[in-house]
């Protein structure tokens, strides 16, 4: 199994992906998504703009919106920001979420036509690696979304490094990778404590490896791109270009 790295904000054209793409956004898109699934969310619909989110919400009864603008502030009028801390104690059982963010969701949609697309974050890294290994792909593309002109994106690079070690069959100590999330440029902004949209609790929740035993797989259902939790045993081990997770029709 080969791996390669791509950086979302360096791409001029979308390269042809081979087999599996993992779109990584540790701070915070796909950490927030993981906590939403843990709170009971049935599905997450990624969309590119706030206007699309509002339009889709009207078509999906009882759905909720979550997201942030560049820099991390919540999208005005949304039910939730892009914050795992904001979901603490919230019951999302059976609800559908609509998510828009400047990095993770944009990266996910950029590779919407890839054979298999996972949303990656540190909190479900091991489960993601386990799901990918079961697919036996020839190549895995790791897409770093958090690198910007003023941010090194090392929180996502650390997650990619951890995933690579896991995919190689290793048993790496997650602690150094967790520390890199905290010490990244964006991580230090949360630690500074001077921006209410970037709470320290979010950093604490995002910089924890392997909290959850599910991967997050993006699939197309009824014409929409949907993110779903993929738990151990739900993956039908077939060639990667014919992947079908058992039970997904029950979640959408």
Map each language-model feature to its residues:
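N- or domain-start disorder-to-order transition segments that initiate the globular core
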Residues: 1-8
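Conserved active-site and cofactor/substrate-binding residues in soluble primary-metabolism enzymes
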Residues: 27-31, 48-51, 102, 123, ...
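Active-site catalytic microenvironments in core metabolic enzymes, especially phosphate/sugar-handling
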Residues: 145
